[in-house]
């Protein structure tokens, strides 16, 4: 309903849900519509294109993109594969390794493997050397992530991560840490890199509260809205030109390797002493669509949205020019026999 257009209503989800209507999305001869449920169905809205601005499982991980693909609706951003790869921290690292892209040393395992041979898993983790970062493999927003300095902390952190996922990843923590983010806009054919930001925090990593509720103690203070758009940052990042350009090139390599589209944000970890750069992870639907990075790159928010939508329309048209299936009925000559294979001797 109209209440969904009032951002203040999102402060109270229970009230919002009471007044909102459930709808379905359908495609009728190329016309995309939202329709109410129930006996007397009415068209709520006609759609030209969908702009997903969502977080979490079943949203960023390719699920909602798969639903939109099934319905046939054009949408902004990365497709099913890119979205799912961008959500699985283990698979994405395996891809980066195959392309010699820089990542921190890590080990991963399933929860059942940990319970079957806890000592062996702990032994592998110890070889990385403390401090370590323990993460659920498929969650974002820093949920379930723990920074650990010893064996006891490691075991507790693994137990915590298992509450959120069946697959766990343990990474060597980067010391002398500088956190830098770069947004990328484009598709597999062309990529633009934004101005870099340096994220300021006294914690080992940004928490969920830092990212979405604007909490946590930081070294600098800023004004603005809550969440990632108001996280304390320095723009542009305080890096030399060579390092800045290297980060931008790696960001574009990541974007292309995962077949991303639209706008994303690639998060980096830099060792301030050695100046080594490591890919942390991509965010296929970044908080605030990283508009603040593009504004710093002389691309206003309205222009960013226009370019994202233009890319989506182009991608939709290109896809429908490809041949993905052949119209044939393999059962047309079926007569109860075992078919061709059944006749072979």
Each model region followed by its residue ranges:
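Short acidic-glycine loop/turn motifs at beta-strand connectors
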Residues: 1, 186-189, 271-274
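ATP-binding N-terminal substructure of ATP-dependent carboxylate-amine bond-forming enzymes
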Residues: 1-81, 85-91, 110-120, 324, ...
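Active-site nucleotide/adenylate-binding loops and adjacent lid/helix of ATP-dependent enzymes
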Residues: 37-44, 83-177, 188-189
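Hydrophobic beta-strand scaffold residues
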Residues: 74-75, 103, 132, 301
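ATP-dependent carboxylate activation and anion-phosphoryl transfer catalytic cores
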Residues: 100, 228, 232-345
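Phosphate-binding site of ATP-dependent enzymes
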Residues: 146-226, 238-246, 277
């Amino acid at each position: 309903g109209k209440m969904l257009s009032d951002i203040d209503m999102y402060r109270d989800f229970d009230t919002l849900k009471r007044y909102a209507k459930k709808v379905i999305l359908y495609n009728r001869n190329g016309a995309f519509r939202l329709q109410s449920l129930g006996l007397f169905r009415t068209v709520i809205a006609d759609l030209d294109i969908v702009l997903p601005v969502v977080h979490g499982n079943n949203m960023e991980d390719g699920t909602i993109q798969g639903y939109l693909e099934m319905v046939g609706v054009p949408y902004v951003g990365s497709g099913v594969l890119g979205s799912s790869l961008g959500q699985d921290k283990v698979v994405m690292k395996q891809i980066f390794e195959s392309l010699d892209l820089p990542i921190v040393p890590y080990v991963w395992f399933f929860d059942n493997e940990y319970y079957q041979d806890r000592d062996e898993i702990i032994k592998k983790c110890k070889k990385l050397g403390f401090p370590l970062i323990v993460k659920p493999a498929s969650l974002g927003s820093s949920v379930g992530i723990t920074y650990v300095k010893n064996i006891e902390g490691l075991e507790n952190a693994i137990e915590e991560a298992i509450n959120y996922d069946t697959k766990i990843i343990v990474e060597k923590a980067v010391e002398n840490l500088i956190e830098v983010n770069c947004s990328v806009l484009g598709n597999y054919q062309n990529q633009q890199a934004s101005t870099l930001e340096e994220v300021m925090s006294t914690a080992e990593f940004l928490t969920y509260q830092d990212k979405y509720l604007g909490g946590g103690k930081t070294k600098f203070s800023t004004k603005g809205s809550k969440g990632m758009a108001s996280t304390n940052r320095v723009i542009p990042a305080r890096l030399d030109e060579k390092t800045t350009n290297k980060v931008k090139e790696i960001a574009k390599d990541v974007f292309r390797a995962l077949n991303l589209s639209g706008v994303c944000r690639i998060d980096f970890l830099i060792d301030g002493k050695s100046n080594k750069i490591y890919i942390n992870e991509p965010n296929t639907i970044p908080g605030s669509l990283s508009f603040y990075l593009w504004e710093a790159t002389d691309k206003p928010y309205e222009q960013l949205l226009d370019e994202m939508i233009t890319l989506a329309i182009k991608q939709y048209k290109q896809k429908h020019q490809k041949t993905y299936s052949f119209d044939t009925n393999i059962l047309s000559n079926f007569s109860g026999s075992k078919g061709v294979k059944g006749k072979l001797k």
